[in-house]
Protein backbone atom coordinates (compact mmCIF):
# COMPACT_ATOMS: atom_id res chain seq x y z
CA UNK A 1 0.00 0.00 0.00
CA UNK A 2 1.05 3.61 -0.42
CA UNK A 3 1.93 5.55 2.68
CA UNK A 4 1.83 2.80 5.28
CA UNK A 5 0.64 3.65 8.77
CA UNK A 6 2.74 3.82 11.93
CA UNK A 7 1.79 0.72 13.89
CA UNK A 8 2.81 -0.36 17.38
CA UNK A 9 2.11 -3.97 18.30
CA UNK A 10 2.22 -4.33 22.09
CA UNK A 11 3.14 -7.78 23.39
CA UNK A 12 4.26 -9.56 26.54
CA UNK A 13 6.53 -12.00 24.72
CA UNK A 14 7.78 -12.53 21.18
CA UNK A 15 9.24 -15.24 19.00
CA UNK A 16 12.97 -15.72 19.14
CA UNK A 17 12.97 -16.54 22.86
CA UNK A 18 12.42 -20.06 24.26
CA UNK A 19 9.05 -20.60 25.89
CA UNK A 20 7.02 -18.16 23.82
CA UNK A 21 3.35 -19.12 23.86
CA UNK A 22 0.43 -18.57 21.53
CA UNK A 23 -0.16 -14.85 22.17
CA UNK A 24 3.53 -14.06 21.61
CA UNK A 25 3.52 -16.09 18.41
CA UNK A 26 0.41 -14.28 17.15
CA UNK A 27 1.82 -10.84 17.98
CA UNK A 28 5.16 -11.62 16.32
CA UNK A 29 3.58 -12.96 13.13
CA UNK A 30 1.25 -9.96 12.94
CA UNK A 31 4.10 -7.46 13.34
CA UNK A 32 6.14 -9.15 10.60
CA UNK A 33 3.17 -9.41 8.24
CA UNK A 34 2.28 -5.73 8.65
CA UNK A 35 5.90 -4.72 8.16
CA UNK A 36 6.17 -6.78 4.99
CA UNK A 37 3.09 -5.03 3.61
CA UNK A 38 4.45 -1.51 3.85
CA UNK A 39 3.59 -0.38 7.37
CA UNK A 40 6.05 1.21 9.78
CA UNK A 41 5.95 -1.31 12.64
CA UNK A 42 7.34 -1.28 16.15
CA UNK A 43 7.02 -4.38 18.32
CA UNK A 44 6.83 -3.08 21.89
CA UNK A 45 7.57 -5.73 24.51
CA UNK A 46 6.22 -4.99 27.99
CA UNK A 47 8.49 -5.50 31.02
CA UNK A 48 8.68 -8.95 32.53
CA UNK A 49 10.31 -11.01 29.79
CA UNK A 50 13.96 -10.89 28.73
CA UNK A 51 14.08 -10.79 24.92
CA UNK A 52 17.82 -10.40 24.50
CA UNK A 53 19.42 -11.94 22.72
CA UNK A 54 16.88 -13.00 20.12
CA UNK A 55 17.59 -16.11 18.12
CA UNK A 56 19.41 -15.36 14.83
CA UNK A 57 16.41 -16.69 12.90
CA UNK A 58 13.98 -14.20 14.41
CA UNK A 59 16.44 -11.35 14.52
CA UNK A 60 16.65 -11.75 10.73
CA UNK A 61 12.88 -12.13 10.33
CA UNK A 62 12.16 -8.90 12.18
CA UNK A 63 14.94 -7.06 10.36
CA UNK A 64 13.82 -8.27 6.93
CA UNK A 65 10.31 -6.97 7.63
CA UNK A 66 11.68 -3.65 8.98
CA UNK A 67 10.10 -4.36 12.37
CA UNK A 68 11.78 -2.56 15.25
CA UNK A 69 11.78 -4.62 18.44
CA UNK A 70 11.68 -2.38 21.51
CA UNK A 71 11.84 -4.15 24.88
CA UNK A 72 10.76 -2.04 27.84
CA UNK A 73 12.24 -2.08 31.31
CA UNK A 74 10.47 -1.24 34.53
CA UNK A 75 12.12 2.17 34.85
CA UNK A 76 9.95 3.36 37.75
CA UNK A 77 8.12 1.85 40.69
CA UNK A 78 4.43 1.34 39.95
CA UNK A 79 1.72 -0.13 42.14
CA UNK A 80 -0.43 -2.15 42.10
CA UNK A 81 1.70 -4.74 40.37
CA UNK A 82 -1.02 -5.73 37.92
CA UNK A 83 -1.11 -2.19 36.46
CA UNK A 84 2.67 -1.74 36.27
CA UNK A 85 3.12 -3.22 32.75
CA UNK A 86 0.40 -0.97 31.35
CA UNK A 87 1.97 2.10 32.99
CA UNK A 88 5.31 1.40 31.32
CA UNK A 89 3.61 0.77 27.97
CA UNK A 90 1.73 4.06 28.37
CA UNK A 91 4.97 5.95 28.98
CA UNK A 92 6.39 4.52 25.75
CA UNK A 93 3.31 5.17 23.62
CA UNK A 94 2.76 8.78 24.60
CA UNK A 95 6.39 9.66 23.90
CA UNK A 96 5.95 8.65 20.24
CA UNK A 97 2.22 8.24 19.49
CA UNK A 98 1.59 5.87 16.56
CA UNK A 99 -1.38 5.87 14.21
CA UNK A 100 -2.57 2.47 15.43
CA UNK A 101 -1.87 0.38 18.51
CA UNK A 102 -2.59 -3.35 18.43
CA UNK A 103 -2.41 -4.43 22.05
CA UNK A 104 -2.57 -7.92 23.44
CA UNK A 105 -5.26 -8.19 26.11
CA UNK A 106 -3.00 -10.42 28.20
CA UNK A 107 -1.89 -8.40 31.28
CA UNK A 108 -4.14 -5.49 30.18
CA UNK A 109 -1.17 -3.86 28.47
CA UNK A 110 -3.13 -0.97 26.94
CA UNK A 111 -5.10 -0.09 30.08
CA UNK A 112 -3.26 3.07 31.19
CA UNK A 113 -2.95 4.39 27.63
CA UNK A 114 -6.64 3.82 26.92
CA UNK A 115 -7.62 5.44 30.20
CA UNK A 116 -5.41 8.44 29.39
CA UNK A 117 -7.09 8.80 26.00
CA UNK A 118 -10.53 8.51 27.59
CA UNK A 119 -9.81 11.42 29.94
CA UNK A 120 -8.31 13.53 27.16
CA UNK A 121 -4.69 13.62 28.29
CA UNK A 122 -2.92 11.96 25.34
CA UNK A 123 -3.14 9.69 22.29
CA UNK A 124 -6.28 11.36 20.93
CA UNK A 125 -5.26 10.61 17.34
CA UNK A 126 -4.24 6.99 17.98
CA UNK A 127 -6.62 4.13 17.19
CA UNK A 128 -6.53 1.09 19.48
CA UNK A 129 -7.24 -2.49 18.45
CA UNK A 130 -7.60 -4.97 21.32
CA UNK A 131 -6.18 -8.34 20.24
CA UNK A 132 -8.06 -10.70 22.51
CA UNK A 133 -6.38 -14.00 23.38
CA UNK A 134 -8.32 -14.55 26.60
CA UNK A 135 -8.76 -12.92 30.01
CA UNK A 136 -7.14 -14.17 33.20
CA UNK A 137 -10.24 -16.23 34.00
CA UNK A 138 -9.97 -18.18 30.73
CA UNK A 139 -6.29 -18.94 31.37
CA UNK A 140 -7.21 -20.13 34.86
CA UNK A 141 -9.93 -22.39 33.47
CA UNK A 142 -7.45 -23.75 30.94
CA UNK A 143 -5.13 -24.58 33.83
CA UNK A 144 -8.01 -26.33 35.63
CA UNK A 145 -7.88 -24.09 38.67
CA UNK A 146 -9.56 -21.13 40.32
CA UNK A 147 -7.60 -17.84 40.02
CA UNK A 148 -5.66 -17.65 43.27
CA UNK A 149 -4.38 -14.08 43.52
CA UNK A 150 -6.17 -10.78 44.00
CA UNK A 151 -3.76 -9.32 41.43
CA UNK A 152 -5.20 -11.63 38.77
CA UNK A 153 -8.68 -10.42 39.64
CA UNK A 154 -7.53 -6.81 39.35
CA UNK A 155 -5.88 -7.58 36.03
CA UNK A 156 -9.16 -8.92 34.73
CA UNK A 157 -10.95 -5.71 35.75
CA UNK A 158 -8.37 -3.79 33.71
CA UNK A 159 -8.80 -6.20 30.79
CA UNK A 160 -12.54 -5.52 30.80
CA UNK A 161 -11.82 -1.80 30.52
CA UNK A 162 -9.42 -2.38 27.60
CA UNK A 163 -12.01 -4.29 25.58
CA UNK A 164 -14.61 -1.62 26.29
CA UNK A 165 -12.42 1.42 25.50
CA UNK A 166 -10.74 0.12 22.33
CA UNK A 167 -11.83 1.15 18.83
CA UNK A 168 -12.05 -2.45 17.63
CA UNK A 169 -11.76 -5.91 19.16
CA UNK A 170 -10.20 -8.87 17.35
CA UNK A 171 -10.53 -12.44 18.57
CA UNK A 172 -9.04 -15.44 16.77
CA UNK A 173 -12.15 -17.48 17.61
CA UNK A 174 -15.89 -17.00 17.71
CA UNK A 175 -15.87 -19.16 20.83
CA UNK A 176 -13.97 -16.54 22.86
CA UNK A 177 -16.31 -13.73 21.84
CA UNK A 178 -19.25 -15.89 22.88
CA UNK A 179 -17.54 -16.63 26.22
CA UNK A 180 -16.97 -12.93 26.87
CA UNK A 181 -20.56 -12.00 26.05
CA UNK A 182 -21.92 -14.85 28.16
CA UNK A 183 -19.88 -13.48 31.07
CA UNK A 184 -21.29 -9.98 30.41
CA UNK A 185 -18.15 -8.31 29.16
CA UNK A 186 -18.87 -5.08 27.30
CA UNK A 187 -17.00 -5.16 23.99
CA UNK A 188 -16.14 -2.22 21.79
CA UNK A 189 -17.67 -2.29 18.35
CA UNK A 190 -16.83 -3.40 15.79
CA UNK A 191 -15.67 -6.87 16.79
CA UNK A 192 -13.95 -9.23 14.37
CA UNK A 193 -13.11 -12.92 14.30
CA UNK A 194 -9.74 -13.18 12.53
CA UNK A 195 -7.83 -16.40 12.96
CA UNK A 196 -4.20 -16.02 14.01
CA UNK A 197 -1.76 -15.62 11.15
CA UNK A 198 0.16 -18.65 10.00
CA UNK A 199 3.88 -18.78 9.37
CA UNK A 200 3.26 -19.11 5.64
CA UNK A 201 1.36 -15.84 5.23
CA UNK A 202 3.28 -13.92 7.89
CA UNK A 203 6.73 -14.62 6.48
CA UNK A 204 5.68 -15.14 2.87
CA UNK A 205 7.50 -18.47 2.79
CA UNK A 206 5.92 -21.81 1.95
CA UNK A 207 6.46 -24.61 4.46
CA UNK A 208 7.44 -28.16 3.59
CA UNK A 209 4.66 -30.50 4.78
CA UNK A 210 5.50 -33.48 6.94
CA UNK A 211 5.88 -36.89 5.36
CA UNK A 212 2.80 -38.98 6.21
CA UNK A 213 1.20 -42.31 5.41
CA UNK A 214 3.43 -44.55 7.53
CA UNK A 215 2.86 -46.44 10.78
CA UNK A 216 3.07 -44.37 13.96
CA UNK A 217 6.49 -44.79 15.53
CA UNK A 218 6.59 -41.68 17.74
CA UNK A 219 3.86 -40.34 20.03
CA UNK A 220 4.40 -36.71 21.03
CA UNK A 221 2.61 -34.90 23.82
CA UNK A 222 2.77 -31.39 22.31
CA UNK A 223 2.28 -28.46 24.67
CA UNK A 224 3.40 -27.19 28.03
CA UNK A 225 3.81 -30.03 30.51
CA UNK A 226 1.07 -29.12 32.97
CA UNK A 227 -2.37 -30.22 34.10
CA UNK A 228 -4.39 -27.82 31.96
CA UNK A 229 -2.74 -29.03 28.77
CA UNK A 230 -3.90 -32.56 29.56
CA UNK A 231 -0.64 -34.28 30.42
CA UNK A 232 -2.38 -36.60 32.90
CA UNK A 233 -5.11 -37.34 30.33
CA UNK A 234 -2.42 -38.37 27.86
CA UNK A 235 -0.58 -40.55 30.37
CA UNK A 236 -3.79 -42.20 31.60
CA UNK A 237 -4.90 -42.89 28.02
CA UNK A 238 -1.64 -44.73 27.33
CA UNK A 239 -2.21 -46.94 30.36
CA UNK A 240 -5.63 -47.93 28.99
CA UNK A 241 -4.25 -49.14 25.65
CA UNK A 242 -3.53 -52.72 24.70
CA UNK A 243 0.15 -52.78 25.81
CA UNK A 244 1.18 -54.48 22.55
CA UNK A 245 0.28 -51.32 20.63
CA UNK A 246 3.11 -49.52 22.43
CA UNK A 247 5.83 -51.97 21.43
CA UNK A 248 8.71 -50.04 19.89
CA UNK A 249 6.99 -46.64 20.25
CA UNK A 250 9.06 -43.58 21.14
CA UNK A 251 7.34 -41.26 23.64
CA UNK A 252 8.30 -37.60 23.47
CA UNK A 253 7.00 -34.87 25.78
CA UNK A 254 7.58 -31.67 23.83
CA UNK A 255 7.02 -28.40 25.67
CA UNK A 256 8.20 -26.23 28.50
CA UNK A 257 7.64 -27.25 32.10
CA UNK A 258 8.11 -25.81 35.56
CA UNK A 259 7.81 -29.02 37.51
CA UNK A 260 7.57 -32.23 35.50
CA UNK A 261 10.69 -34.40 35.27
CA UNK A 262 11.43 -37.55 33.32
CA UNK A 263 11.44 -39.51 36.57
CA UNK A 264 7.95 -38.23 37.41
CA UNK A 265 6.68 -39.00 33.91
CA UNK A 266 8.00 -42.56 34.12
CA UNK A 267 6.39 -43.01 37.51
CA UNK A 268 3.01 -41.80 36.25
CA UNK A 269 3.19 -44.00 33.15
CA UNK A 270 3.72 -47.12 35.23
CA UNK A 271 5.91 -50.14 34.71
CA UNK A 272 3.83 -51.81 31.99
CA UNK A 273 3.98 -48.79 29.67
CA UNK A 274 7.64 -48.04 30.42
CA UNK A 275 8.57 -51.65 29.67
CA UNK A 276 6.80 -51.63 26.30
CA UNK A 277 7.90 -48.33 24.75
CA UNK A 278 11.29 -47.98 23.13
CA UNK A 279 12.17 -44.61 24.69
CA UNK A 280 10.83 -41.80 26.86
CA UNK A 281 12.21 -38.28 26.42
CA UNK A 282 11.39 -34.78 27.59
CA UNK A 283 12.35 -31.86 25.33
CA UNK A 284 11.58 -28.74 27.36
CA UNK A 285 13.88 -26.04 25.96
CA UNK A 286 13.33 -26.13 22.21
CA UNK A 287 12.23 -23.05 20.33
CA UNK A 288 9.29 -23.11 17.95
CA UNK A 289 11.26 -24.05 14.82
CA UNK A 290 13.11 -26.91 16.48
CA UNK A 291 9.89 -28.22 18.01
CA UNK A 292 8.15 -28.31 14.63
CA UNK A 293 11.15 -30.12 13.13
CA UNK A 294 10.75 -32.83 15.81
CA UNK A 295 7.06 -33.16 14.95
CA UNK A 296 7.76 -33.52 11.22
CA UNK A 297 9.79 -36.68 11.73
CA UNK A 298 8.19 -39.56 9.74
CA UNK A 299 5.79 -41.68 11.77
CA UNK A 300 4.97 -38.95 14.31
CA UNK A 301 1.54 -38.45 15.86
CA UNK A 302 1.07 -35.33 17.99
CA UNK A 303 -1.40 -35.45 20.88
CA UNK A 304 -2.93 -32.32 22.48
CA UNK A 305 -5.64 -33.23 25.04
CA UNK A 306 -6.03 -29.74 26.58
CA UNK A 307 -8.98 -29.00 28.86
CA UNK A 308 -9.60 -25.58 27.30
CA UNK A 309 -8.14 -23.60 24.40
CA UNK A 310 -9.00 -20.41 22.56
CA UNK A 311 -7.29 -20.78 19.18
CA UNK A 312 -4.24 -22.93 19.91
CA UNK A 313 -1.16 -22.45 17.79
CA UNK A 314 -0.10 -26.01 18.62
CA UNK A 315 -3.08 -27.28 16.62
CA UNK A 316 -2.83 -24.59 13.93
CA UNK A 317 0.85 -25.39 13.34
CA UNK A 318 0.09 -29.08 12.96
CA UNK A 319 -2.57 -28.22 10.39
CA UNK A 320 -0.24 -25.85 8.52
CA UNK A 321 2.68 -28.29 8.42
CA UNK A 322 0.59 -31.37 7.64
CA UNK A 323 1.49 -33.07 10.93
CA UNK A 324 -0.95 -35.84 11.98
CA UNK A 325 -2.52 -35.11 15.36
CA UNK A 326 -5.28 -35.79 17.85
CA UNK A 327 -6.57 -32.85 19.88
CA UNK A 328 -9.27 -32.00 22.39
CA UNK A 329 -12.65 -30.88 21.13
CA UNK A 330 -12.74 -27.77 23.32
CA UNK A 331 -13.07 -23.99 23.07
CA UNK A 332 -12.16 -22.53 19.71
CA UNK A 333 -10.12 -25.51 18.51
CA UNK A 334 -12.82 -26.86 16.14
CA UNK A 335 -12.86 -23.52 14.29
CA UNK A 336 -9.34 -24.27 13.02
CA UNK A 337 -10.24 -27.57 11.36
CA UNK A 338 -12.29 -28.38 8.27
CA UNK A 339 -15.75 -29.69 9.10
CA UNK A 340 -15.16 -33.04 7.46
CA UNK A 341 -12.02 -33.70 9.54
CA UNK A 342 -13.24 -32.69 12.99
CA UNK A 343 -14.77 -36.02 14.02
CA UNK A 344 -11.55 -37.83 13.07
CA UNK A 345 -9.08 -35.74 15.03
CA UNK A 346 -11.03 -34.03 17.83
CA UNK A 347 -12.02 -35.88 20.99
CA UNK A 348 -13.29 -35.05 24.48
CA UNK A 349 -10.32 -34.60 26.85
CA UNK A 350 -10.78 -37.80 28.85
CA UNK A 351 -8.49 -40.84 29.14
CA UNK A 352 -11.17 -43.15 27.72
CA UNK A 353 -11.81 -40.99 24.66
CA UNK A 354 -8.15 -40.47 23.84
CA UNK A 355 -7.43 -44.16 24.35
CA UNK A 356 -10.26 -44.89 21.91
CA UNK A 357 -8.64 -42.55 19.38
CA UNK A 358 -5.06 -43.71 19.92
CA UNK A 359 -5.81 -47.42 19.60
CA UNK A 360 -6.82 -47.42 15.91
CA UNK A 361 -4.14 -44.86 15.05
CA UNK A 362 -1.38 -47.05 16.51
CA UNK A 363 -2.81 -50.20 14.93
CA UNK A 364 -3.00 -48.73 11.43
CA UNK A 365 -0.22 -49.34 8.93
CA UNK A 366 -0.82 -45.83 7.58
CA UNK A 367 -1.33 -43.82 10.80
CA UNK A 368 -3.94 -41.08 10.42
CA UNK A 369 -4.35 -38.44 7.76
CA UNK A 370 -3.50 -34.82 8.62
CA UNK A 371 -6.42 -32.45 9.13
CA UNK A 372 -7.17 -29.63 6.71
CA UNK A 373 -7.73 -25.99 7.67
CA UNK A 374 -11.22 -24.57 8.09
CA UNK A 375 -10.27 -21.39 6.22
CA UNK A 376 -7.68 -20.33 3.70
CA UNK A 377 -4.76 -18.79 5.65
CA UNK A 378 -4.74 -15.76 3.36
CA UNK A 379 -8.17 -14.72 4.69
CA UNK A 380 -6.65 -13.71 8.03
CA UNK A 381 -3.98 -11.55 6.43
CA UNK A 382 -6.51 -9.77 4.20
CA UNK A 383 -8.78 -9.09 7.17
CA UNK A 384 -5.94 -7.66 9.27
CA UNK A 385 -4.68 -5.45 6.46
CA UNK A 386 -8.15 -4.03 5.84
CA UNK A 387 -8.68 -3.35 9.54
CA UNK A 388 -5.29 -1.69 10.02
CA UNK A 389 -5.81 0.54 7.00
CA UNK A 390 -9.28 1.70 8.05
CA UNK A 391 -9.49 1.79 11.85
CA UNK A 392 -9.67 5.28 13.35
CA UNK A 393 -10.09 6.55 16.90
CA UNK A 394 -13.70 7.02 17.90
CA UNK A 395 -14.91 10.61 17.98
CA UNK A 396 -15.46 11.78 21.54
CA UNK A 397 -16.81 15.34 21.67
CA UNK A 398 -15.88 17.05 24.96
CA UNK A 399 -18.59 17.78 27.48
CA UNK A 400 -19.26 20.90 29.48
CA UNK A 401 -16.30 22.03 31.59
CA UNK A 402 -16.90 22.57 35.29
CA UNK A 403 -17.06 26.31 35.97
CA UNK A 404 -16.78 26.27 39.77
CA UNK A 405 -15.14 23.84 42.17
CA UNK A 406 -15.23 23.85 45.96
CA UNK A 407 -12.05 22.56 47.62
CA UNK A 408 -12.95 21.37 51.12
CA UNK A 409 -9.86 21.31 53.34
CA UNK A 410 -10.11 19.41 56.62
CA UNK A 411 -6.87 20.35 58.35
CA UNK A 412 -4.37 23.17 58.76
CA UNK A 413 -1.86 21.90 56.20
CA UNK A 414 -4.56 21.06 53.68
CA UNK A 415 -6.11 24.54 54.01
CA UNK A 416 -2.82 26.20 53.06
CA UNK A 417 -2.42 23.81 50.13
CA UNK A 418 -6.00 24.43 49.02
CA UNK A 419 -5.40 28.18 48.85
CA UNK A 420 -2.24 27.70 46.78
CA UNK A 421 -4.08 25.28 44.50
CA UNK A 422 -6.85 27.82 43.98
CA UNK A 423 -4.31 30.45 42.93
CA UNK A 424 -2.69 28.02 40.47
CA UNK A 425 -5.91 26.74 38.85
CA UNK A 426 -6.81 28.30 35.51
CA UNK A 427 -9.77 26.29 34.18
CA UNK A 428 -12.35 26.88 36.93
CA UNK A 429 -13.21 29.29 39.71
CA UNK A 430 -12.19 27.75 43.02
CA UNK A 431 -13.99 28.18 46.33
CA UNK A 432 -11.75 27.22 49.28
CA UNK A 433 -13.63 25.96 52.33
CA UNK A 434 -11.71 25.28 55.52
CA UNK A 435 -13.78 23.01 57.76
CA UNK A 436 -13.35 20.66 60.70
CA UNK A 437 -15.15 17.89 58.84
CA UNK A 438 -16.30 16.93 55.37
CA UNK A 439 -19.90 17.28 56.49
CA UNK A 440 -19.30 20.84 57.63
CA UNK A 441 -17.55 21.69 54.39
CA UNK A 442 -20.37 20.28 52.26
CA UNK A 443 -22.88 22.42 54.13
CA UNK A 444 -20.98 25.52 53.01
CA UNK A 445 -20.25 24.45 49.42
CA UNK A 446 -22.22 26.03 46.59
CA UNK A 447 -20.15 24.92 43.58
CA UNK A 448 -21.33 22.09 41.32
CA UNK A 449 -18.15 20.10 41.96
CA UNK A 450 -16.17 19.41 45.13
CA UNK A 451 -12.68 18.15 45.94
CA UNK A 452 -11.85 16.91 49.44
CA UNK A 453 -8.29 17.75 50.45
CA UNK A 454 -6.90 16.03 53.55
CA UNK A 455 -3.63 16.69 55.33
CA UNK A 456 -2.00 13.68 53.66
CA UNK A 457 -2.83 15.06 50.18
CA UNK A 458 -0.15 17.27 48.60
CA UNK A 459 -1.58 18.47 45.25
CA UNK A 460 0.50 19.31 42.21
CA UNK A 461 0.01 22.73 40.67
CA UNK A 462 -2.07 21.27 37.84
CA UNK A 463 -4.24 18.92 39.91
CA UNK A 464 -7.54 20.74 39.57
CA UNK A 465 -6.99 21.70 35.94
CA UNK A 466 -6.24 18.06 35.19
CA UNK A 467 -9.30 16.76 37.03
CA UNK A 468 -11.62 19.32 35.43
CA UNK A 469 -10.33 18.55 31.93
CA UNK A 470 -10.61 14.80 32.51
CA UNK A 471 -14.19 15.16 33.70
CA UNK A 472 -15.16 17.17 30.63
CA UNK A 473 -13.54 14.62 28.32
CA UNK A 474 -15.00 11.54 30.00
CA UNK A 475 -18.33 12.80 31.31
CA UNK A 476 -17.67 10.91 34.54
CA UNK A 477 -19.39 11.64 37.84
CA UNK A 478 -16.13 11.16 39.74
CA UNK A 479 -12.56 11.63 38.52
CA UNK A 480 -9.70 10.40 40.68
CA UNK A 481 -6.01 10.39 39.86
CA UNK A 482 -2.87 8.38 40.34
CA UNK A 483 -0.64 9.67 43.13
CA UNK A 484 2.99 9.52 44.23
CA UNK A 485 3.30 7.79 47.62
CA UNK A 486 5.38 9.98 49.92
CA UNK A 487 7.36 7.04 51.25
CA UNK A 488 8.70 5.58 47.99
CA UNK A 489 8.39 8.17 45.21
CA UNK A 490 6.88 5.75 42.71
CA UNK A 491 3.39 5.87 41.24
CA UNK A 492 0.18 4.46 42.69
CA UNK A 493 -2.52 3.91 40.08
CA UNK A 494 -6.20 3.15 40.57
CA UNK A 495 -8.83 1.33 38.56
CA UNK A 496 -11.48 3.99 39.17
CA UNK A 497 -14.30 1.47 39.21
CA UNK A 498 -12.81 -1.84 40.37
CA UNK A 499 -16.08 -3.77 40.53
CA UNK A 500 -16.11 -6.40 43.27
CA UNK A 501 -12.45 -5.73 44.07
CA UNK A 502 -13.64 -2.53 45.74
CA UNK A 503 -15.02 -4.71 48.52
CA UNK A 504 -11.58 -5.55 49.88
CA UNK A 505 -9.45 -2.51 49.03
CA UNK A 506 -9.79 1.05 47.82
CA UNK A 507 -9.03 0.77 44.13
CA UNK A 508 -11.21 3.82 43.39
CA UNK A 509 -8.75 6.56 44.37
CA UNK A 510 -7.64 8.66 47.33
CA UNK A 511 -8.30 12.12 45.90
CA UNK A 512 -10.93 13.07 43.35
CA UNK A 513 -13.38 15.50 41.84
CA UNK A 514 -17.01 14.66 42.72
CA UNK A 515 -20.36 16.13 41.75
CA UNK A 516 -21.55 18.01 44.83
CA UNK A 517 -25.02 16.50 44.45
CA UNK A 518 -23.45 13.05 44.92
CA UNK A 519 -20.87 13.86 47.58
CA UNK A 520 -21.17 12.79 51.21
CA UNK A 521 -19.10 13.07 54.37
CA UNK A 522 -17.89 9.47 54.05
CA UNK A 523 -14.23 8.55 53.67
CA UNK A 524 -12.87 8.19 50.14
CA UNK A 525 -13.24 4.40 50.06
CA UNK A 526 -16.81 4.39 51.36
CA UNK A 527 -17.90 7.39 49.28
CA UNK A 528 -16.53 6.10 46.00
CA UNK A 529 -17.74 2.53 46.63
CA UNK A 530 -21.29 3.71 47.25
CA UNK A 531 -21.28 5.85 44.13
CA UNK A 532 -19.88 3.07 41.94
CA UNK A 533 -22.43 0.60 43.31
CA UNK A 534 -25.18 3.12 42.53
CA UNK A 535 -24.13 3.12 38.88
CA UNK A 536 -22.20 6.39 38.89
CA UNK A 537 -19.23 6.57 36.54
CA UNK A 538 -15.78 6.77 38.13
CA UNK A 539 -12.60 7.09 36.09
CA UNK A 540 -9.03 7.53 37.27
CA UNK A 541 -6.26 9.50 35.54
CA UNK A 542 -3.15 7.30 35.13
CA UNK A 543 -0.75 10.23 35.61
CA UNK A 544 0.15 11.14 39.21
CA UNK A 545 -1.18 14.64 39.93
CA UNK A 546 -0.56 14.68 43.68
CA UNK A 547 1.60 13.26 46.43
CA UNK A 548 -0.13 11.15 49.05
CA UNK A 549 1.21 10.52 52.53
CA UNK A 550 -1.22 7.81 53.62
CA UNK A 551 -2.03 4.28 52.57
CA UNK A 552 -5.13 3.41 50.55
CA UNK A 553 -7.72 1.85 52.83
CA UNK A 554 -8.16 -1.92 52.74
CA UNK A 555 -9.73 -4.58 54.93
CA UNK A 556 -6.39 -5.19 56.63
CA UNK A 557 -5.74 -1.60 57.75
CA UNK A 558 -9.21 0.01 57.92
CA UNK A 559 -11.70 -2.52 59.34
CA UNK A 560 -14.36 0.07 60.22
CA UNK A 561 -14.36 1.43 56.67
CA UNK A 562 -14.34 -2.13 55.34
CA UNK A 563 -17.53 -2.85 57.28
CA UNK A 564 -19.23 0.24 55.83
CA UNK A 565 -18.18 -0.81 52.32
CA UNK A 566 -19.49 -4.32 52.96
CA UNK A 567 -22.86 -2.89 53.99
CA UNK A 568 -22.92 -0.83 50.78
CA UNK A 569 -22.33 -3.98 48.72
CA UNK A 570 -25.05 -5.83 50.63
CA UNK A 571 -27.65 -3.22 49.71
CA UNK A 572 -26.60 -2.98 46.07
CA UNK A 573 -27.91 -4.89 43.07
CA UNK A 574 -25.36 -3.67 40.52
CA UNK A 575 -22.71 -5.24 38.29
CA UNK A 576 -20.19 -5.69 41.09
CA UNK A 577 -22.42 -8.28 42.76
CA UNK A 578 -22.18 -10.55 39.72
CA UNK A 579 -18.42 -10.62 40.20
CA UNK A 580 -18.58 -11.59 43.88
CA UNK A 581 -18.64 -15.38 43.33
CA UNK A 582 -15.38 -15.19 41.36
CA UNK A 583 -13.81 -12.85 43.92
CA UNK A 584 -14.91 -15.11 46.78
CA UNK A 585 -13.45 -18.17 45.04
CA UNK A 586 -10.25 -16.25 44.35
CA UNK A 587 -9.92 -15.24 48.00
CA UNK A 588 -10.56 -18.80 49.10
CA UNK A 589 -7.92 -20.18 46.76
CA UNK A 590 -5.48 -17.47 47.82
CA UNK A 591 -6.05 -18.17 51.51
CA UNK A 592 -5.63 -21.90 50.98
CA UNK A 593 -2.24 -21.25 49.41
CA UNK A 594 -0.98 -18.44 51.63
CA UNK A 595 -2.98 -18.49 54.84
CA UNK A 596 0.05 -18.83 57.07
CA UNK A 597 1.51 -15.60 55.66
CA UNK A 598 -1.66 -13.49 55.88
CA UNK A 599 -1.81 -11.02 58.83
CA UNK A 600 -4.33 -11.91 61.51
CA UNK A 601 -6.36 -8.71 60.99
CA UNK A 602 -6.81 -9.48 57.31
CA UNK A 603 -7.88 -13.06 58.06
CA UNK A 604 -10.50 -11.84 60.50
CA UNK A 605 -11.87 -9.32 58.00
CA UNK A 606 -12.00 -11.92 55.22
CA UNK A 607 -13.84 -14.36 57.47
CA UNK A 608 -16.36 -11.63 58.27
CA UNK A 609 -16.90 -10.91 54.58
CA UNK A 610 -17.34 -14.59 53.77
CA UNK A 611 -19.89 -15.03 56.57
CA UNK A 612 -21.86 -12.01 55.35
CA UNK A 613 -21.77 -13.20 51.73
CA UNK A 614 -23.02 -16.67 52.68
CA UNK A 615 -26.06 -15.42 54.62
Stretch-by-stretch model annotation:
Residues 255, 264-294:
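Nucleotide-activated donor-binding/catalytic signature segment of Leloir-type glycosyltransferases, i.e.
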Residues 450:
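Short aromatic/hydrophobic "clamp" motif used to bind/position activated sugar donors
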Residues 343-352, 361-365:
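Conserved acidic donor-binding segment of nucleotide-sugar-dependent glycosyltransferases
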Residues 25, 29, 226-240:
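A conserved mid-protein helix/loop that constitutes part of the nucleotide-sugar donor-binding site
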Residues 307:
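Aromatic "clamp/platform" in nucleotide-sugar-dependent glycosyltransferases that forms part
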Residues 559-615:
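Boundary detector for helix-to-coil junctions that initiate low-complexity/charged tails
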Residues 175, 197:
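Carbohydrate-associated surface elements
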